[in-house]
Each structure stands twice: as C-alpha cells, then as structure tokens.
C-alpha cells in the first residue's frame, strides 16, 4: 500500500499536465481534517495518508506518495446548509453568531455554507435568513481558529441549543445563569478546532 506523506505547498506551481494526470483522492471535510487515515483513490487503489498533525486538506491540494507519484485532493459533495439573506446585514449577523461558537463556515458571494445541523438551521432561520439543505463540496475558512468541525448530537448539541435559546431571547423575563465547563476527550489538530471552552452566559 502506498503512503501519501507530503503535501506540496500551495505556493509551489506544478505543471498543469502533471496535476491533470495525477489520480484523485476525493474526501469530505471531516476526512480532510484527519492527518492519518486509510483512504481509497478514485482509481480504486487503497492508500494510507500520513501527514503532519493539524494538516487540513483543501480541494486542489497535491500530495506526494512515498514512491514520488502525485495525488490530487478533491472536496467531496456532502450535506450542507446553504444560508442566504435578503440583505447583507442579516447575513453578517448570522456569520457573527456562527463564528461566536467557532462553527466552521464557508463564506461565499452572498451566502454562507456550513455542515448540516438542525439546531443551527433553526437558529439561522430565526435570525431571518433563508436556509436550504443541499449537497455540495464544503470548504470552510481556515480563520483565526483554524478549520474546525463538530460532532452531530453529542456534547455540543446542548451547547448549540443553549446558544439558540440565548440568541433568540427565549428566556425573556427570567434570570438564567449558564455555566458550562466541558471536558471533551477529543483530540484534533489545530486546524480542526471544536472550540473547547467554558461558557458563562448571563
């Protein structure tokens, strides 16, 4: 089994013909966050990916196998939320609230894209945005916190729901104090940050 253990720096320009001839490894965002994984090229060949911890692969990246061959990375279509708004301010507000919980977000011309999550979808709709579930490649911003991903309905589900309640003032007339201090037994590279932090919401 061949091992893909080097990524060619994005600023290194390769001959287009070399890249065009390279086999493709198509991966969803979650897999592109992993520095070590067993994968299958689009040709059907099984390979091992062994990259420095914290590496987050992007569509178009080129890896080098231990035999010197090149492999091109492609972002696989996956289930995502496509968020649009009637005005830029509403979309900016949505981006702010997503960034506030370190949710990985792809920012495009007039849209936001994020991993499908029913709680976040509800929050975004209440903020006044149009949210549609679709199937498309997902390439979030690296940003100050690195990439980042979340795990469906585990410990972060409660945090998502608490955030949704807080954002929309569902506790008007009440004095709530939420103290969250979660210890997650997850290990991710710096490019895939959950946002492991305590919240103190008043």
UniProtKB/Swiss-Prot annotation:
SUPFAM superfamilies: Urease metallochaperone UreE, C-terminal domain, Urease metallochaperone UreE, N-terminal domain. It comes from Burkholderia cenocepacia (strain HI2424). GO terms for molecular function: nickel cation binding; unfolded protein binding. Residues 171-202 are annotated as: Disordered. InterPro entries: UreE, UreE_C_dom, UreE_N, UreE_N_sf. Keywords: Chaperone, Cytoplasm, Nickel, Nickel insertion. GO terms for cellular component: cytoplasm. This is Urease accessory protein UreE. It comes from the Bacteria. GO terms for biological process: protein folding; protein-containing complex assembly; urea metabolic process. It is found in: Cytoplasm. Its main location: cytoplasm. Belongs to the UreE family. Residues 171-188 have a biased composition (Basic and acidic residues). Transmembrane segments: none annotated. Involved in urease metallocenter assembly. Binds nickel. Probably functions as a nickel donor during metallocenter assembly.
């Amino acid at each position: 089994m061949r091992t893909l253990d080097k990524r060619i720096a994005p600023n290194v320009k390769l001959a287009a013909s070399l890249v065009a001839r390279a086999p493709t490894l198509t991966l969803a965002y979650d897999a592109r966050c992993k520095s070590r994984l067993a994968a299958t090229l689009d040709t059907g060949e099984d390979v091992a990916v062994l990259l420095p911890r914290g590496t987050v692969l992007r569509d178009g990246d080129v890896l080098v196998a231990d035999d010197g061959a090149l492999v091109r990375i492609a972002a696989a279509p996956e289930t995502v939320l496509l968020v649009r708004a009637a005005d830029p301010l509403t979309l900016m507000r949505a981006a702010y609230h997503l960034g506030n919980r370190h949710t990985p977000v792809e920012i495009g011309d007039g849209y936001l894209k994020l991993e499908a999550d029913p709680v976040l979808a509800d929050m975004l709709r209440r903020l006044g945005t149009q949210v549609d579930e679709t199937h498309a490649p997902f390439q979030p911003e690296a940003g100050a916190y690195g990439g980042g991903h979340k795990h469906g309905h585990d410990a972060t589900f409660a945090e998502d729901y608490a955030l949704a309640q807080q954002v929309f003032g569902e506790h008007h007339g009440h004095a709530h104090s939420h103290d969250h201090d979660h210890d997650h037994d997850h290990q991710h590279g710096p490019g895939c940050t959950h946002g492991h932090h305590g919240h103190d919401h008043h």
